[in-house]
């Protein structure tokens, strides 16, 4: 009961300290509130295990200790924690740790660490903030876990607990790891440290005292550990290792990321283009051709859409790179400027800028020539093909004679075919092909019309030359008159 009272008092203090921050962050609370509710079981399990299973929580903590021991500052913390006597040493604690660290003391000690360690904490906080933007709601959830009342108290503290402060802070530090936010987090850490002692250090292992993983501020480690907690236990076990690795690796990378975000996100929609151009700008002479090669490869779509027609995309790529090499200085400036207004499309405005900087002779003349050079070849080639494929239509006299012969016999003998070829000034091959085509046409017509085969043959074969030759098939015109409407158009094609 004393613990509960102490916790309540400390929580009230925290709430008072945090109200002014929360007023600013009320609009974020709902969003983060949902996030906290989604932090599934581990939070509640920790709150429920305050009395029953402290050893579970400290197993997590101990795992973190084991992994985190890498950084010297974390070693210091571990020493401090171990030096402090434990209020609750369950057999599991005794097995895993001789003296399980009483969390709250460690948290307080961290706050009182020498200045260099605090600086390290700040750095790590900033880095972890950037890492843990997604995980911040979890950190907040831990503080609610500190309340012995359980999930209900957790939800209440979701509104008041420092994690709301951390959420906005950590989101903003994403690109700018501001010292102010880190200071706020240290305040929160202190608050957590104050809360922890009242909690009989049971909740603490998952809360502020979890920090042994990398001396980085307790809050940050809480974020890491909690982030892993909602991922379920296997992730937690793997987590501390990742925490140390990420804290070490991100120490290098977060600086670069912050640099990219601050400097280049203003101009770019995507971080990948940022990197290439980040290198291209400072060293236009040496590395700018690389940027240019990137440019043509990434920009064919944009070049065609913005400045060029799809017809000479390849042409444009070649000449863009060439023009860029011709005037490295001009193109470097141009390539840097357009992103400001072309963020949605990446580098869509780039080609036009490139042309303007490189000069009309370099860029626009290419634009004019690009489409023209292939076209003449295409026209010549198509012209040749069209000439080859052109078929001189048969004269009316030739078609009429062939139709007459087709009436007598759809299949022409070699003798007759030779005579027709000589009389009509055609080759035998032409005559043969004409009869083949005529038979096919007749067949199709007969299929389309469900009339008798005779009617189809008569109509399809005779209506073309019905006016000219009426000697032997005048009797068919009665049938033709019925079918002429259908076949006239077909036969004269």
UniProtKB/Swiss-Prot annotation:
Compositionally biased region (Basic residues): 30-39
UniProt GO cellular component terms: nucleus; polytene chromosome band
Polar residues biased stretches: 144-153, 174-184
Record's keyword terms, sorted: Developmental protein, DNA-binding, Homeobox, Nucleus
Tissue specificity of this protein: Isoform M and isoform R are expressed in ectodermal and mesodermal tissues and central nervous system of fourth to ninth embryonic abdominal segments. Later in embryogenesis, expression is seen in visceral mesoderm surrounding hindgut and in two Malpighian tubules.
Location of the DNA-binding region in this protein: 387-446
BP-aspect Gene Ontology terms: determination of genital disc primordium; external genitalia morphogenesis; female genitalia development; genital disc anterior/posterior pattern formation; genital disc sexually dimorphic development; germ cell migration; gonadal mesoderm development; imaginal disc-derived female genitalia development
InterPro entries per record: HD, HD_metazoa, Homeobox_CS, Homeodomain-like_sf, HXA10/ABDB-like
Keyword Cytoplasm: no
Domain of life: Eukaryota
GO molecular function: DNA-binding transcription factor activity; DNA-binding transcription factor activity, RNA polymerase II-specific; RNA polymerase II cis-regulatory region sequence-specific DNA binding; transcription cis-regulatory region binding
Compartments it resides in: Nucleus
Broad class of where this protein is predominantly found: nucleus
Ranges for region Disordered: 1-199, 322-360, 438-475
Keyword Nucleus (UniProt): yes
Compositionally biased intervals (Low complexity): 1-29, 54-95, 105-134, 154-173, 329-345, 447-475
Protein task: Sequence-specific transcription factor which is part of a developmental regulatory system that provides cells with specific positional identities on the anterior-posterior axis.
Similarity field: Belongs to the Abd-B homeobox family.
Protein name: Homeobox protein abdominal-B
Biological source species: Drosophila melanogaster
